[in-house]
Amino acid sequence: MNSLSKYIRQRFNISLWCLVAIMLIALSLKEFSISLVHVYSIPFVLFFLFTMRLFDDLASAKIDSEEANRDYTNEVTKKELQTILIISQIVLISILAFFDMERAVNLFFFLVFNTILYYLLFNVSKFRHFLPLLKYPFVIYILNLEPSFNLIAVYVAFVIFEMLEDPLFPNYLLTNYKAAIPDKKIIPYLFLLLFLLTQIILKNV
């Protein structure tokens, strides 16, 4: 359990990820009306995001071994966290199956599909940065079970966010932005907020 608590301290800012969970739930709304179901969804979405974050970090352990405060790159800690990851995935599917078997099946296939993608593409550097972002549109899909172009918009929005926020993320069209405004750390978050507000407004027009 010590390895888990240390991992959470190093890699999972609960306050920040709670905000991400709330944002994703808001994006899943068909109209701007919040029910108790949406409130109850927050812990589940947060747990899912934690599980996927852990999955990605363990996949990146070899690459991140030179980085500071990355205890999950230690072989002993990594094995402990791999066990925790498997347990977390089983718990996620079990919780969802208790309430909705269709959603549980969708989650199971997503986890399998995501693992296959990591196995095939993670070592191809141009794909490595994009794979962890698949979890965001999936959260919205699992909440409302409606495939739509909105899922693509959410994925693209998080790609842009990462381009703005992460200096290691492929630059593409934002090279000039990063060179001109290197210290504007608030801009990526303002972009996500603007995207969220735009989506809410469009759904209620």
What residue spans do the PLM features occupy?
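Multi-pass alpha-helical membrane architecture of UbiA-family
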Residues: 1-205
